Amino acid sequence: MAGQKIRIRLKAYDHEVIDTSARKIVDTVTRTGAKVAGPVPLPTEKNVYCVIRSPHKYKDSREHFEMRTHKRLIDIIDPTPKTVDSLMRLDLPAGVDIEIKL
């Protein structure tokens, strides 16, 4: 797999969970002998939802809720077959969305 690069993009609502997952990935990759660039924090996506507080009237009284999506980017340079195998076996929390590109 010489000359290749694996790009891993992580998304989660909780920043602590995504940081521990990124740390696990970096530790696993460095143990297998590949080079790692990252984790690079990408801009946090913020969605704001506006809801009327009352079920019937009082349109002027509203409540705002927000949902933040934290993102990280990890590049693995010159991965070995052992690196790919260890990444496949890695156990990550359920709240983390993983996107892998070769």
Curated annotation (Swiss-Prot):
Keyword field: Ribonucleoprotein, Ribosomal protein
GO MF terms held by the record: structural constituent of ribosome; tRNA binding
InterPro entries in UniProt: Ribosomal_uS10, Ribosomal_uS10_CS, Ribosomal_uS10_dom, Ribosomal_uS10_dom_sf
Ribosomal protein in keyword set: yes
A GO CC term assigned to this protein in UniProt: ribonucleoprotein complex
Cited SMART domains: Ribosomal_S10
Domain of life assignment: Bacteria
Biological-process GO terms, alphabetical: translation
Assembly, per entry: Part of the 30S ribosomal subunit.
Record-stated family: Belongs to the universal ribosomal protein uS10 family.
HAMAP family per record: Ribosomal_uS10
Role noted for this protein: Involved in the binding of tRNA to the ribosomes.
Name the record gives this protein: Small ribosomal subunit protein uS10
Organism: Nocardioides sp. (strain ATCC BAA-499 / JS614)
UniProt lineage: Bacteria, Bacillati, Actinomycetota, Actinomycetes, Propionibacteriales
